[in-house]
Amino acid sequence: VLEENGKLWNAAACLCEDGSRHYYRKSHLTEREAQWAEAGDCAGLVLDRPYGRTGVLLGNEIFITEVPRLLANRGCDILAVPAVENPSCPPGIPEVQQEVEHYHLARVRANENSTYAAFAAQKGVSGIFGPDMFLVPRNEVVLNESGFADMTMDTRFIFSDESGCPVINLVREKPMLGTRHTTWYDK
């Protein structure tokens, strides 16, 4: 909770290596949050860090397709998603008989937007999901209990594959963005 000028916000604090602090004020509030919190800016928080451009969304905003999409359109390589109550499935949608991570929304959003998703749940599955769901083995770290997830995320524009050939990084190329009709959600 962030308090400014007598107003309360559901917020995430981002502390950077240089000591600076940045706050993301959640813009898509639940009914319960709307009883005490102000809605934040829909533009979201985007930070240019040495490891890649990072976009922050909070809690249930992972359920809203457009929020991660707008961050990806702003060039984010990584989606940072702290504090979701139930990450596997939005309310009202039945769970499926798959491994619990298979349809995990952080995994789906990372794939839809060609980004990484670093995801912390209050309960359930947390982890870091890579941009390609079809890569085997998957480029991800999944935690089903308390712990620390650590993974190398390659956000370079071009790198070499096993044969030494240059490859454009999926996270930077963002091929999925080229198929979108942005007139529906551009301001």
Located regions from the model:
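Catalytic-core segment of enzymes that process non-peptidic bonds
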Residues: 1-56, 111-148
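Active-site-proximal loop/turn and secondary-structure-junction residues that shape catalytic pockets
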Residues: 28-30, 60, 84-86
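Active-site mouth loops of central-metabolism enzymes
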Residues: 56-62
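CN hydrolase (nitrilase-like) catalytic-core segments centered on the catalytic cysteine
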Residues: 63-148
